[in-house]
């Protein structure tokens, strides 16, 4: 794990910009029409992508696909000399990918760059939207999730990286769908890579049932065959 222990404890995972506060009901959830993982040219460590896609396809009703994306970032998007401002990145990503998919496409940009928010030293992932919005997007930084250098092609620890990203993306999908349950099981809020690695990769029973009823999760995990 890179970074000091102090920074690790200060890290926040998957900060949702819009969170519903009303009591949960199946009718309030929206299922994605598809889940798209966008891969910029700068992301050269990609061995984790295939197992990530396979894992998501096993549990999600919606199809999951990857998409190459030409995207660049200007200096005014920097939060520090070595970190991008996650809000500026997400806003830019939303504009670049706006013509791809539909309002119910859940779109995720996988970046090798470190991200920062205004109040946190760094973030692993952030998502924007909920069941009421016409956008559902997320940004995931593999800078600290990749066990090697994400800007260099390598095979080291691909399954570890895939599982870390899987937990973040699956939690985000549930939140963007409108799930407002407490932070528990996969929805828990780790503050370090160790906590992320140790936390469950599954939903608690009540949340799992709500997501199945809403058509977000499959009733039984299985390969989709696509």
Q: What are these regions, as identified by a protein language model?
A:
Residues 46-168, 179:
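Metzincin-family zinc-dependent endopeptidase catalytic domain
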Residues 21-25:
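Boundary at the C-terminal end of the N-terminal hydrophobic targeting segment
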Residues 135-164, 180-226:
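Metalloprotease/metallohydrolase-associated module, dominated by Zn2+-dependent proteases
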Residues 29-30, 49:
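Eukaryotic intrinsically disordered, low-complexity regulatory regions enriched in Ser/Thr and Pro
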Residues 1-9:
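Bacterial N-terminal signal peptides that target proteins for export
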Residues 10-17:
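Bacterial N-terminal signal peptides
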């Amino acid at each position: 794990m890179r970074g000091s222990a102090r920074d690790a404890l200060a890290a926040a995972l998957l900060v949702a910009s819009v969170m519903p506060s009303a009591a949960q009901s199946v009718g309030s959830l929206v299922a994605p029409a598809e889940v798209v993982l966008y891969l910029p040219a700068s992301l050269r460590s990609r061995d984790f992508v295939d197992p990530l896609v396979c894992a998501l396809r096993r549990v999600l009703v919606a199809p999951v696909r990857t998409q190459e994306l030409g995207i660049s970032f200007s200096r005014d998007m920097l939060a520090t000399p070595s970190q991008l401002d996650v809000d500026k990145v997400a806003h830019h990503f939303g504009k670049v990918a706006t013509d791809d998919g539909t309002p119910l496409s859940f779109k995720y940009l996988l970046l090798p760059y470190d991200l920062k928010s205004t109040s946190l030293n760094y973030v692993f992932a952030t998502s924007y939207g909920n069941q009421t919005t016409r956008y559902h997007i997320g940004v995931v930084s593999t800078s600290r999730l990749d066990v090697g250098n994400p800007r260099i092609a390598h095979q080291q620890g691909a399954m570890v990286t895939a599982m870390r990203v899987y937990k973040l993306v699956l939690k985000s999908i549930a939140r963007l769908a409108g799930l407002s349950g407490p932070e528990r099981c996969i929805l828990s809020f780790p503050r370090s890579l160790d906590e992320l690695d140790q936390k469950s990769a599954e939903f608690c029973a009540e949340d799992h049932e709500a997501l199945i009823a809403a058509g977000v999760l499959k009733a039984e995990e299985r390969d989709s065959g696509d």
